[in-house]
Swiss-Prot record:
It holds the Pfam family PALP. This is Tryptophan synthase beta chain. Its EC number is 4.2.1.20. InterPro entries: Trp_synth_b_CS, Trp_synth_beta, Trp_synth_beta/beta-like, TrpB-like_PALP, TrpB-like_PALP_sf. GO terms for cellular component: cytoplasm. The lineage of its organism: Archaea, Methanobacteriati, Methanobacteriota, Methanomada group, Methanococci.
Length: 404
């Protein structure tokens, strides 16, 4: 594979576009808030006013426990017939990559003088990360969560409440992540002066996709240093799961201009042909959702369809603008795996390595198992293990017909 075009630090353009994707499709009432956010991000992140970056990286080091290890999975490597490394985001504080972005944005909110932070959450991981970041930085925290997800993720709801957040269940629509985002946007429109909207993935109107990518880039930066130290060369393949896309763009970004194959693994649910899936890149159309032009799951009338996945974090009917763009460019390969394949991979990693992966990350693992057939024993594959699976044990037990 040869990279004919540079992608790193080239996008988005001044209008927040990645090719045709992205932009700012928001009501007039939110435009001042978006402009204020853009200006603040430029001041504090890009121009590093008040040593913002140093403060952020110190929090990542001392509070999150970064860098997370790059772990050589010896028994999994033997099983698959190639060298397999796991980027252990499951070992970050709170058990997922979500805290990287939550801390970055909460710190930005504080510098902007906002007192109140709102967020949406699906699996609950972003909600927990936001609640923790707000507790750490002394900010009021409100979390919107689809009523179905509240039911699926009771443990995370209680974790958020323990950290002082108020969790508001959303009963409209499909009662999942999409509806939680809608509700959070309504709140922001009403309380724009005092409130910061902390978006959980590389989605939404500009500058969010760029901001989230920048805060998650640390994954790929560490990964590049670590693999060079361990192997003396870059990996052949990096595999990451994709819901909205933040862990994937975080892992991929540093490698966009390198000769490394990048696989974005979506939720195939009960199979693409059934319509019960969350695979917008593999089976979606271009549309507008939550403030940006992206690949979405929609029906023949252009209406957004409900997504489905056994994993709450992949249960979203769209994918961020940068990944949408990179798919069209042929720079990433979009693939999907079913619930059943993810469950198999979940059990495989538990059995071979004693590591309990999140169901989201199990999708990346499941595709890695398939991909290994095409790799040689000296080929290096890195799987971004985006989170740990404690939150999913009940879901897995139920799917396997076990009472706990």
């Amino acid at each position: 594979m040869s990279i004919l075009k540079k992608y790193k630090d080239m996008y988005p353009d001044e209008n927040g576009k990645f090719g045709i994707y992205g932009g700012k499709f928001v009501p007039e009432t939110l435009m001042p808030a978006i402009a204020e956010l853009e200006e603040a991000f430029k001041r504090f992140w890009i121009n590093n006013e008040g040593n913002f970056r140093e403060e952020f990286y110190a929090l990542l080091r001392d509070y999150v426990g970064r860098p997370t290890p790059l772990y050589y999975a010896e028994r999994l490597s033997e099983e698959l017939g190639c060298k397999v490394y796991l980027k252990r985001e499951d070992l970050a504080h709170l058990g997922a990559h979500k805290i990287n972005n939550a801390l970055g944005q909460a710190l930005l909110a504080k510098k902007m003088g906002k007192k109140r932070v709102i967020a949406e959450t699906g699996a609950g991981q972003h909600g927990v990360a936001t609640a923790a970041a707000c507790a750490k930085l002394g900010l009021e925290c409100i979390i919107y969560m689809g009523a179905k997800d509240v039911e699926r993720q009771k443990l995370n709801v209680f974790r958020m409440e323990l950290m002082g957040a108020k969790v508001i269940p959303v009963f409209g629509g499909s009662q999942t992540l999409k509806d939680a985002v809608n509700e959070a946007l309504r709140d922001w429109t009403t309380n724009v002066r005092t409130t910061y909207y902390l978006l959980g993935s590389a989605l939404g109107p500009h500058p969010y996709p760029m901001m989230v990518r920048e805060f998650q880039r640390v994954i790929g930066k560490e990964l590049k240093e670590q693999i060079l130290e361990k192997e003396g060369r870059l990996p052949d393949v990096i595999v990451a799961c994709v819901g909205g896309g933040s862990n994937a763009i975080g892992a991929f970004y540093e490698f966009l201009d390198d000769d490394v194959e990048l696989y974005a693994v979506e939720a195939g649910g009960k199979g693409i042909e059934t319509g019960m899936h969350g695979a917008s890149l593999c089976a979606g159309e271009v549309g507008v959702l939550h403030g940006a032009k992206i690949y979405v799951k929609e029906d023949e009338f252009g209406q957004i369809e409900e997504s489905y996945s056994i994993s709450a974090g992949l249960d979203y009917p769209g994918v961020g603008p940068e990944l949408s763009f990179l798919k069209d460019e042929g720079r990433i390969k979009a693939v999907c795996v079913t619930d059943d394949e993810a469950l198999e991979a979940f059990q495989l990693l538990c059995r071979l390595e004693g590591i309990l992966p999140a169901l989201e990350s199990s999708h990346a693992l499941a595709y890695a198992v398939k991909l290994a057939d095409k790799l040689d024993k000296d080929d290096i594959m890195v799987i971004n293990l985006s989170g740990r699976g404690d939150k999913d044990v009940q879901t897995v037990a139920k799917a396997l017909g076990r009472e706990i």
